[in-house]
């Protein structure tokens, strides 16, 4: 199933041998990686393997070779049931999808984070000494700054790294292209500077912090949790700081069901105020019943 993960490094966790771009490309062409790609992408293994080759080439062209470059993947997500219920400390049924954000990255031993997005034609450099949001509080730069600040305020380490990223997670289609990107960056920061000690819940809270504080968007934890954990899952947000996640073993294809995603061609960048109003309106309803959130209100 899809979840935020390292792609090549999983094969060398025990030995942790450093590999440069050429060596990583060679590993990418191995039979072992072929089997993993087929497990992850099914019939789309060949075309998706080409995406990883492309980001490696893009990384080398942009940043030169590196003593240790790693490949990362983070999927988009879909809500099967439950929308905005995370704001109410309720339950959701969600799943990751086979569209993902992938990237090649390596530490650059500087005080700068340099990210190139092939998909959105962006070349971003952020100084770790300047993580204040812009006046506008919007866009990729603010989001990345929010993630970096979220790591710092949560007691985690950050540092300079280079990344070359591409994504086929459709924007404006309700599959969380932003959360997919957030979890990818969190995975890079965790791997490079925190010895991979962080868990998915920590990722999700940092992604939520970035959107809440640096985008002024009242996001919950659903999107980030679904992208980070992967597969078909239920999440109970009765304790938002420690949501309870359970995986569900169910094959929709075996039941003759397919999920159809439609790219509307219409963004929602101008709807942040309306989006943020939803949890506030729900809390007003809960307050009417003398409660803080709707999960505390009896159905009777």
Predicted features by range, described:
Residues 1-18:
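Short, Lys/Arg-enriched N-terminal segments with co-localized hydrophobic residues
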Residues 14-77, 102, 106-137, 234-300:
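C-terminal nucleotide
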Residues 73-89, 168-185:
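Glycine/serine-rich anion-binding loops at beta->alpha junctions
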Residues 91-109, 229:
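Structural signature of FAD isoalloxazine-binding scaffolds in flavoprotein oxidoreductases
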Residues 96-98, 175-195:
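DPxDG-like acidic metal-binding loop motif
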Residues 135-169:
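Helix-rich "cap/lid" substructures immediately adjacent to catalytic or cofactor-binding pockets
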Residues 153-160, 189-203:
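Phosphate-handling active-site elements
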Residues 195-243, 248:
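Alpha/beta catalytic cores of group-transfer enzymes, especially the acyltransferase/condensing modules
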């Amino acid at each position: 199933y899809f979840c935020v993960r390292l792609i090549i490094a999983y094969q060398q966790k025990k030995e942790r041998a450093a590999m440069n771009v050429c060596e990583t490309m060679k590993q990418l062409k191995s039979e072992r990686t072929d089997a993993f790609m087929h497990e992850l992408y099914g019939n789309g293994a060949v075309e998706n393997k080409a995406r990883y080759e492309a980001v490696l080439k893009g990384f080398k062209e942009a940043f030169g070779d590196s003593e240790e470059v790693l490949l990362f993947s983070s999927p988009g997500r879909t809500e099967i049931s439950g929308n905005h219920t995370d704001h109410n400390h309720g339950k959701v049924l969600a799943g990751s999808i086979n569209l993902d954000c992938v990237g090649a990255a390596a530490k650059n031993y500087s005080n700068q984070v340099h990210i190139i997005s092939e998909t959105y034609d962006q070349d971003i450099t952020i100084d770790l000494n300047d993580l204040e949001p812009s006046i506008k509080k919007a866009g990729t730069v603010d989001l990345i700054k929010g993630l970096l600040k979220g790591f710092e305020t949560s007691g985690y380490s950050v540092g300079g790294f280079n990344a070359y990223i591409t994504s086929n997670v459709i924007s404006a289609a309700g599959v969380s292209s932003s959360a997919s990107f957030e979890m990818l960056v969190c995975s890079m920061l965790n791997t490079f500077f925190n010895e991979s000690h962080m868990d998915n819940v920590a990722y999700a809270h940092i992604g939520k912090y970035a959107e809440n504080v640096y985008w002024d968007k009242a996001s919950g934890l659903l999107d980030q949790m679904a992208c980070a954990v992967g597969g078909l899952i239920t999440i109970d947000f009765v304790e938002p700081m420690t949501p309870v996640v359970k995986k569900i073993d169910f094959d929709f294809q075996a039941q003759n069901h397919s999920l159809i995603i439609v790219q509307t061609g219409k963004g929602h960048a101008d709807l942040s105020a309306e989006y943020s109003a939803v949890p506030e309106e729900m809390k007003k309803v809960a307050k009417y019943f003398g409660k803080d959130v709707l999960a505390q209100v009896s159905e009777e």
